[in-house]
Every structure is written in structure tokens, then in C-alpha cells.
């Protein structure tokens, strides 16, 4: 459990790091698509549209064209194209970086969902379903006949040339409940990362009742097995109310029984 908790904490830290990088990339993308002269110089400087006769990048560098502080080789005074990289290439790089970060974030979320699903045997989480792209009011959970069904449906409407077009998107996941979980005790929650968690207040049974497992609500002992791991049900153990001896052996050790038979 300690190793699993450490792994989940590491995945959460990675997801937060990716979210921060995505926000930084969005800021860079907004900065790169906007000209600081309040004109869209895309993809070139377009000095003919500048309100000044020339770009004045060298005389008023800090006021008229703030980009020249980053690219000092601007040749706007002679009405040539700027030697800085094209904003289109910067946009393409930013878009590729954003797509890579989104794929990495989706991969981390899938890994987290798999870890949560695999940890169901050691926690009260029975299952986890990813419903990314759906609102909480569009998700429905139904528990019936020992099964949990998670479904979600969304309607998209498009206006095209005066006509309306519709498209539908839906998912449906179903899994069975453990034998010791009551349907009335099953609850669900819409958590972080568009993930629906199915939970129960009682832990699922992981192993059958045996003398080495003490009594618990989900693991009741057999009448022949005492509620003590050190006292298994066998003819060799001493007499006590929870562990009666075999009629062939009196209350004592095996030596006394063998002596009586001889």
C-alpha cells in the first residue's frame, strides 16, 4: 500500500507539472500571435501599414516595437522583411508542443485510472471510469442485479447554411460487484480528471475464510475455526469452547491418548 500511495502521489505531481507547462505554452502562444505595436505583423512586419513613416525600431525601441528587444536584427528602417523567425513557425512549434503535452497528460490519466482500478482489492474503490468530454449531469450510474452500469450521452448541434445538424456521442461501461458488496451501499462520485469512481463502505472480500484470518465483517469465520490465528481447528490443539477436541482424543496431549490406547 505504501508503494502504491507513493506511485499515485508521483502521478499526481506529474499531472500538475504538465498542467503548468500547458498554461505556460498557452501564454507563449497568445504572446507570439500578437504584435506589440497593436498591429498584426503576421507573417511579416508589414511596415507599410505602420502608423509611423518607418517602424522606428532603433529610435523608439521600447515604445513602438517591443519585439525588437528580443530580435535586435530588425531591418524595418530600410523597409526589408524582419530577420526574426516567422510567427507561423512559432505557432506551429507551440501547437506541436501543446499537442504533445495533451497526449502526455492523457497518458498519465490513463495510467492513474489503471492504478485505481488495480487497487480495488486493497481499498473501498470498486471501479473507475473515464468520462472525459461529458458534463456531470450527462453521466448516469445504474446498479442492478449485482452489476454497475456507467453511461453518458451528449448531443452536439451545428448550424450550417440555415439548417441544423446533430451528432451524438455516448459511452457505456459495465462491471460486476464483488459477492460481499450490497447494491444499496454502492456510491459514486465525479472526481478530478473527469473520472467517475464507484465506491462502497465495505471492503471487498479478497480471500476465503481460513484459520489464519481473524474475524471481520467481510470475512466471517467458520464455526469450526476460532477467532484466533494461533488456535487452528485440529485434534492436536487443547480444548476450549471455540475448538472442541475430537472424541477419539481426550483433553490432553497426543502422548496421553497414545498411552491410554496401549
Swiss-Prot record:
S-S bridge residues: none
Primary localization: other
Signal peptide extent: none
Modified residues (Phosphoserine): 5, 10, 64, 86, 122-123, 151, 167, 189, 194
GO BP annotations listed: cell differentiation; spermatogenesis
Region feature C-X-P repeat region, mapped onto this chain: 209-250
2 X 5 AA repeats of [RC]-C-L-C-D: region residues: 34-77
Pfam families listed in its UniProt record: HSP20
Keywords carried by this UniProt record: Cell projection, Cilium, Cytoplasm, Cytoskeleton, Developmental protein, Differentiation, Flagellum, Phosphoprotein, Repeat, Spermatogenesis
Ranges occupied by Sequence repeats: 34-38, 73-77
Domain of life: Eukaryota
Annotated localization: Cell projection, Cilium, Flagellum; Cytoplasm, Cytoskeleton; Cytoplasm, Cytoskeleton, Microtubule organizing center, Centrosome
One GO CC term on file: sperm flagellum
Domain statement: The C-terminal contains many C-X-P repeats.
Function description: Component of the outer dense fibers (ODF) of spermatozoa. ODF are filamentous structures located on the outside of the axoneme in the midpiece and principal piece of the mammalian sperm tail and may help to maintain the passive elastic structures and elastic recoil of the sperm tail.
Subunit structure: Interacts (via leucine zipper motif) with TCP11. Interacts with SPAG4. Interacts with KLC3. Interacts with CCDC42.
Protein name: Outer dense fiber protein 1
Amino acid at each position: 500500500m505504501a508503494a502504491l500511495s507513493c506511485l499515485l502521489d508521483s502521478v499526481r505531481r506529474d499531472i500538475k507539472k504538465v498542467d503548468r507547462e500547458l498554461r505556460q505554452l498557452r501564454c507563449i502562444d497568445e504572446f507570439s500571435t500578437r504584435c506589440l505595436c497593436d498591429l498584426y505583423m503576421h507573417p511579416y512586419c508589414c511596415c507599410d501599414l505602420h502608423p509611423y513613416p518607418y517602424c522606428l525600431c532603433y529610435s523608439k525601441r521600447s515604445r513602438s516595437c517591443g519585439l525588437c528587444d528580443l530580435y535586435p536584427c530588425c531591418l524595418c528602417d530600410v523597409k526589408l522583411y524582419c530577420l526574426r523567425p516567422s510567427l507561423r513557425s512559432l505557432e506551429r512549434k507551440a501547437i506541436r508542443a501543446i499537442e504533445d503535452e495533451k497526449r502526455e497528460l492523457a497518458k498519465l490519466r490513463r495510467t492513474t485510472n489503471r492504478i485505481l482500478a488495480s487497487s480495488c482489492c486493497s481499498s473501498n474503490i470498486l471501479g473507475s471510469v473515464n468520462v472525459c468530454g461529458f458534463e456531470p449531469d450527462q453521466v448516469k450510474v445504474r446498479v442492478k442485479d449485482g452489476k454497475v452500469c456507467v453511461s453518458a450521452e451528449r448531443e452536439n448541434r451545428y448550424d450550417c447554411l440555415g439548417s441544423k445538424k446533430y451528432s451524438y456521442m455516448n459511452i457505456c461501461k459495465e462491471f460486476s460487484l464483488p459477492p460481499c458488496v450490497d447494491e444499496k451501499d454502492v456510491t459514486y462520485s465525479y472526481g478530478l480528471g473527469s473520472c467517475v469512481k464507484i465506491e462502497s463502505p465495505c471492503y471487498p472480500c479478497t480471500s476465503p475464510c481460513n484459520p489464519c484470518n481473524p474475524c471481520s465483517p467481510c470475512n466471517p469465520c467458520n464455526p469450526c475455526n476460532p477467532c484466533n490465528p494461533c488456535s487452528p481447528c485440529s485434534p492436536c490443539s487443547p480444548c476450549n469452547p471455540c475448538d472442541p477436541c475430537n472424541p477419539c482424543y481426550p483433553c490432553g496431549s497426543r502422548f496421553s491418548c497414545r498411552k491410554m490406547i496401549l
